[in-house]
């Protein structure tokens, strides 16, 4: 019996659609990012799934707020993945 799908060599597109625990090689989906404050342009390192409010050290502006999963960036903040 021949399978239509190769289970040992899945395509990257099919691996991206799977749940994080069902992938062939488990990998985390969280990351650290550099967030730039829109007011004073200070860069702060923030975890993508932060569970507390992150405030800018320079001007005390809220950079991101926690949700149930990923943290929501404040409007106007730009970020870069590390």
UniProtKB/Swiss-Prot annotation:
SUPFAM superfamilies associated with the record: Zn-binding ribosomal proteins (SSF57829)
Example of a GO biological process term: ribosomal small subunit assembly
Keywords: Cytoplasm, Metal-binding, Ribonucleoprotein, Ribosomal protein, Zinc, Zinc-finger
Keyword Ribosomal protein assigned: yes
TM helices/strands, residue ranges: none
GO terms, molecular function: RNA binding; structural constituent of ribosome; zinc ion binding
Subunit-structure text: Component of the small ribosomal subunit (SSU). Mature N.crassa ribosomes consist of a small (40S) and a large (60S) subunit. The 40S small subunit contains 1 molecule of ribosomal RNA (18S rRNA) and at least 32 different proteins. The large 60S subunit contains 3 rRNA molecules (26S, 5.8S and 5S rRNA) and at least 42 different proteins.
Name the record gives this protein: Small ribosomal subunit protein eS27
Origin species: Neurospora crassa (strain ATCC 24698 / 74-OR23-1A / CBS 708.71 / DSM 1257 / FGSC 987)
Gene name in the database record: crp-6
């Amino acid at each position: 019996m021949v399978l239509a799908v190769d289970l040992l060599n899945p395509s990257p597109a099919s691996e991206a659609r799977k749940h994080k625990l069902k992938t062939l090689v488990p990998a985390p989906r969280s990351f650290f990012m550099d967030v730039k404050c829109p007011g004073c342009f200070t860069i702060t390192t923030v975890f993508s799934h932060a569970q507390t409010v992150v405030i800018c050290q320079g001007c005390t502006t809220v950079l991101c707020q926690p949700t149930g999963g990923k943290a929501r960036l404040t409007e106007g903040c730009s970020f870069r993945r590390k």
